[in-house]
Curated annotation (Swiss-Prot):
Organism: Synechococcus sp. (strain CC9605)
Annotated HAMAP family: Ribosomal_uS11
UniProt superkingdom: Bacteria
Transmembrane stretches, start-end: none
The protein's assembly and partners: Part of the 30S ribosomal subunit. Interacts with proteins S7 and S18. Binds to IF-3.
UniProt xrefs under Pfam families: Ribosomal_S11 (PF00411)
GO MF annotations in UniProt: rRNA binding; structural constituent of ribosome
Similarity field: Belongs to the universal ribosomal protein uS11 family.
GO cellular component entries: ribonucleoprotein complex; ribosome
Protein name according to UniProt: Small ribosomal subunit protein uS11
PROSITE patterns, A to Z: RIBOSOMAL_S11
An example Gene Ontology biological process: translation
UniProt entry keywords in alphabetical sequence: Ribonucleoprotein, Ribosomal protein, RNA-binding, rRNA-binding
Function: Located on the platform of the 30S subunit, it bridges several disparate RNA helices of the 16S rRNA. Forms part of the Shine-Dalgarno cleft in the 70S ribosome.
Amino acid sequence: MAKTVKKSGPKKAKRNVPNGVAHIQSTFNNTIVSITDTAGEVISWSSAGASGFKGARKGTPFAAQTAAEAAARRALDQGMRQIEVLVRGPGSGRETAIRALQVAGLEITLIRDVTPLPHNGCRRPKRRRV
């Protein structure tokens, strides 16, 4: 039977990345924040679900704020100072996540909305009758 070899030390090497891009995907059910370098390699990420929220609470602005703070904290540990922010989706945590990134100590140089809009593509789901 093969023996498992135990590795010691940090799992991921710390890199010095001064600027990057924060991708905020905000849906009605969750908010995902990924911070990448300029080449697109993910430095840190977090989501409302990964921050400990479950169910309907994942879609709240407070959950988005918590997720953005967690991702920003890890990015600051990697040496990140300046970020561009790309926001995608219609969720309620968009503005809150951007504000949380700024409060965490990251300098925001650009905010761009990259929500995909169909040019009359697929048929929309039927309306909910509650």
